[in-house]
Amino acid sequence: RIADLKAAGWYSGDVHVHANLFAQDLIKPADVLAVGRAEDLNVLNILPCNDPRTTLISDLQFFTGGPDPVSDENHIVYYNEEMRNDLYGHVGFLNLKTFVEPAYFGFPHSPHPYDAPGNFPQVEAAKRQGAFVSYVHPGLPSEFPIDIALGLADTIDVMSQVDERNSLPM
């Protein structure tokens, strides 16, 4: 390594991981930890979210409201949440104690087919429990300017793994 960032007080992490979204095999917390160790990541935030083709919320069975028991002194595996609406934007909730429901809305084939109530109530519910709120997937339509103005959004992604051309000009 060129530098020992941990010795300088820095920790590496990935705050937007989907372990089992579209996965063919079940990826368990120990598997996530193994990948994190291989990538030298100290913090792994897994974001359970809805599969847009079904009503399944991937990884919800691993949500505990705190670091997963596989975590150790150098690695934190934490199942949190990505709340999704394709009109208002996708939002990552980190440091959750309780999963925020509904976790998605505006998907016509689901129990939550309409674009209501908007992201604000879910974001507010996450903040009440001490969550860090991050708007993810730049380029999607989003209500993040409103939530930022109201003091509810902590950050927004500026780059996405799926749309680099539209992310970079932002």
Residue ranges and their predicted role:
Residues R1-M170:
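Extended, charged catalytic domains and RNA/DNA-binding interfaces, predominantly
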